[in-house]
């Protein structure tokens, strides 16, 4: 498949399609079903689903996506965290910069056996009540969690060990991620050097602004925390040469101008940057703060004037 993607890019003169996979966070699943070094040779990105570590299928409450473990947790439970799972993929042979960390914008809920016992590990009788819109026991979208938090007699707790919040009211309990926990996870990701984030899923964020902090507050918090973060793709794997001994495709050259000719081209990976070609010489430039590059006009412009960059309006 990798060769097919490369061949399609060469024949069409388009950018190569990305070959990615969503993979489990469970250390047991990794060991049982994945040849990690072989996967890493061919995949552009490896999306690690670092969530659903705990849920209504268990008899004790646990957080959906803890960054770190409780000090009191068993050796097995300490492996059910974002930190451990992401690093397990590295230990098994995945390059740091190819690993994309899953960020949930939903919560897992439980019905407590005893409302007076609500800490992590408390006994549960099953999933919590179904959400008004998602309609699934044991699961709430972030905008449904906001409704839960707004109701009287709800207690919100920040778990300093796991670096995530949970809340309870009566016999209902929900573990989830908020702006604080997701910013913390992104900061951790940057420190460790992972490739980036993937969100599950954008439609579960507060897309109407019901929670009171604007539309898509969780997504925006992560994007803001990631601003300016870059990683170098240090390892791309020993890709095979097409049958027949054909030479490996050369990197497409952006600047093909005649000597003395100047042209401007947008950076397809960053609206705020562009390339200046002087003959065959390439220069990477940045627009002033608040502006993006308008390739049609060859100038830095307001985001509202560039359709592909309109999502940056107001930032």
Where are these regions (language model features)?
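Substrate-binding surface in catalytic domains of secreted glycosidases
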Residues: 1-145
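Conserved beta-strand elements of beta-rich interaction domains across eukaryotes
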Residues: 24-26, 53, 106, 181, ...
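Acidic-and-aromatic substrate-binding clefts and catalytic sites of carbohydrate-active enzymes
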Residues: 25-30, 176, 205-206
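Well-ordered beta-strand positions
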Residues: 44-45, 196, 273
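Disulfide-rich extracellular ectodomains of metazoan secreted and cell-surface proteins
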Residues: 185, 193, 200-203, 246, ...
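Cysteine-rich, disulfide-bonded extracellular modules and peptides in secreted proteins
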Residues: 231, 243-315
